[in-house]
Amino acid sequence: MGGCTSKPSSSVKPNPYAPKDAVLQNDDSTPAHPGKSPVRSSPAVKASPFFPFYTPSPARHRRNKSRDGGGGESKSVTSTPLRQLARAFHPPSPARHIRDVLRRRKEKKEAALPAARQQKEEEEREEVGLDKRFGFSKELQSRIELGEEIGRGHFGYTCSAKFKKGELKDQEVAVKVIPKSKMTSAISIEDVRREVKILRALSGHQNLVQFYDAFEDNANVYIVMELCGGGELLDRILARGGKYSEDDAKAVLIQILNVVAFCHLQGVVHRDLKPENFLYTSKEENSMLKVIDFGLSDFVRPDERLNDIVGSAYYVAPEVLHRSYTTEADVWSIGVIAYILLCGSRPFWARTESGIFRAVLKADPSFDEPPWPSLSFEAKDFVKRLLYKDPRKRMTASQALMHPWIAGYKKIDIPFDILIFKQIKAYLRSSSLRKAALMALSKTLTTDELLYLKAQFAHLAPNKNGLITLDSIRLALATNATEAMKESRIPDFLALLNGLQYKGMDFEEFCAASISVHQHESLDCWEQSIRHAYELFEMNGNRVIVIEELASELGVGSSIPVHTILNDWIRHTDGKLSFLGFVKLLHGVSTRQSLAKTR
Ligand SMILES: Nc1ncnc2c1ncn2[C@@H]1O[C@H](COP(=O)(O)OP(=O)(O)OP(=O)(O)O)[C@@H](O)[C@H]1O
Ligand SMILES: [Ca+2]
Ligand SMILES: [Ca+2]
Ligand SMILES: [Ca+2]
Ligand SMILES: [Ca+2]
C-alpha cells in the first residue's frame, strides 16, 4: 500500500519545512510520542460497526438517508466514495480519523507478535484503572430534559433537549452524548476533556456553535449546546447535486473563513473541518452556518508545530501527513470544501485511503474539467491559493477573506490575522541587513496585499502618531480575547515582541515586518517584483558583508561546504550581497525559524 503507509516514492520531494524525522511514516512505525498522539479508542474501533470508509462496495453507492434520522449504528452504510459528490457520498463522517486507520493496520500486523500481545494486555489492564471523572456537574436529570436523537458520530450521538429551569427554561438545545464505555484509553478521555475545554473557552463568534454546559454521570458525558436545526452543510451540498453558484459558494465560505480565522487567532486549530461539521441554524435557505465538533481540535501556540496525524482523509493537509503543521492545515480543508462547493467533485480522490493520501501529497487538483472552464479566474485562483501544498504559501483564513473573489462580492470586516504576530516576531529578530531587504521588498507590494496590511495595521490600534506599540497590540488582543488565548499562550508570545516596547512601528515598517516572502513569491509578478526590490536595495541598504556574517544571518554554520555555497551569494567585485544572496537572505530567516520550531 502506498500513501501514508509506505515510504514516499522517489518522486515525492522531501518536505523542506518539515523536521527531519517528519517524513511519512511507514506501516509499522510508531508515533513519535505514543503517549501524546491522539489514538482514538482502539478497542472501540474494533467493535465499531463502521467499515473502513474506503471499502469499495459498489452496490451501495447511495447515501443512507435514514442515518440522520436517528438510526442506530447498524444503519451506517459504507458506500463507494465516488469522486462526484452529486452521485454519491460516503456516509457522513465515516471517514475514520486517520490515526485509527494507521493504528488498526499496525495492530493487525502486530497481533501475531507475542511482545505486542503482551503490551495489549497491559493496555487493557490499564483501562480498568482509568479515571473517567471529569468534574462536570452531575445534575443533568434535574436541569435538562432529553428528547430524541438528531445526529450521530463516531464517538457519540446528539439529542434535542430542553432546559427544565433557570434562565434558559424551555429553550431548545442539543446535547451530544459521549458514552464513557467508548473512552478506553487515557488519551480518549483527554480528548473529551479537551473538546469541552475548547468549546467552553471559545465563545462569542456568530458562526461557532454556542456552548452552554457539560454534565456527566457514570455512563456518559453530556455536552449541552445551541441547537442547530438546519442540518449539515453536507446535506445541502448533496441536495443541490453538489453544485453551487459562485455567489452561493461565497456566502458559505465567508462564514467558514470568518470563524476559522477567529479560532486561529485564539490559538485553536480545529483539525476536522468538513461539510459534516458545519450545521445550519434553521431550515431556511439563508440561515446561519455554525462550526461544530471540536473533538479533534487542539490549542496551538503561535510558534508551535503539531505532529499528530488526525482529521478525515479527503480533507487532510499534506503537512499533516508530514507531521509538522499548525493552523494552515485548517485552511487546506477549507480549500477542499471550496473545491467541492464549486464543482461537486473532490479534489483529491482515490479508492483507498492510502491513494487519497498520495493524491494529497502529490497530485494537483484538476481545474480543466467542467464546470471549471466556465468559472471565473478569481474563483480558481482563490481555490488554488487555499490548496497550495506549501503551507507557507497558502493564504490564511483572514487573507482569504481579502481575496478579490470574496472582496468583490461583499464588504467584510477582515479579522485580525495571527500570522501578523509571527511575522513581526521574526522581523524583530532579524539583522538590519535583512530588515533593509524586507523594506525594499515591501515597496513592491500589490494593491491587494496593501489592503490586507492596512486592515491588519488598523486592528493593532496605532496611536495618534500612526505608530503601533506593544501596548496597542496588547489592547487590540484584549478586545479579541477569549479564554482560549491563555491556553495557547498568546500573551507569552507577546513578550517576544518586546522590541516594540519603547520604539513604535509605523505603517511603512509594519509592511516590511509583515510581508510574507513565501506568499509574495507565489504571485505571478514575483520575478518582476524581486528584481525591482533588489534595485531598491542596491540604492538603499546593500552593503559589504563577509561570509561568516552572512552564515550567521542565515542561521547556518560556516563550515567549508557552506562557505562554498555562500560564496556565490556575495558579489566578488565589491563584497556586497549579490541578487542571489538577496533572495536567499529574504527567505533565510524562515529557514532558521522552522529549524527552531522543530526543536
Ligand atoms: N448543536 C447541534 N445541533 C444539532 N445537531 C447537532 C449538533 N451537534 C451535533 N449534531 C449532530 O450530531 C452529529 C454528531 O455530532 P459530532 O460531529 O459532534 O459527533 P462526533 O461523534 O464527534 O462525530 P464524528 O464522527 O464526526 O467525529 C453531527 O453530525 C450533527 O448531525
Ligand atoms: Ca457525523
Ligand atoms: Ca462530526
Ligand atoms: Ca468528532
Ligand atoms: Ca497541544
UniProtKB/Swiss-Prot annotation:
It catalyses: L-seryl-[protein] + ATP = O-phospho-L-seryl-[protein] + ADP + H(+); L-threonyl-[protein] + ATP = O-phospho-L-threonyl-[protein] + ADP + H(+). It is found in: Membrane. GO terms for cellular component: membrane. Residues 118-128 have a biased composition (Basic and acidic residues). The keyword Lipoprotein applies. Keywords: ATP-binding, Calcium, Coiled coil, Kinase, Lipoprotein, Membrane, Metal-binding, Myristate, Nucleotide-binding, Phosphoprotein, Repeat, Serine/threonine-protein kinase, Transferase. Its EC number is 2.7.11.1. ATP binds at I150, G151, R152, G153, H154, F155, G156, Y157, T158, K176. It holds the Pfam family Pkinase. Binds calmodulin (CaM) in a calcium-dependent manner. This is CDPK-related kinase 2. It comes from Arabidopsis thaliana. The lineage of its organism: Eukaryota, Viridiplantae, Streptophyta, Embryophyta, Tracheophyta.
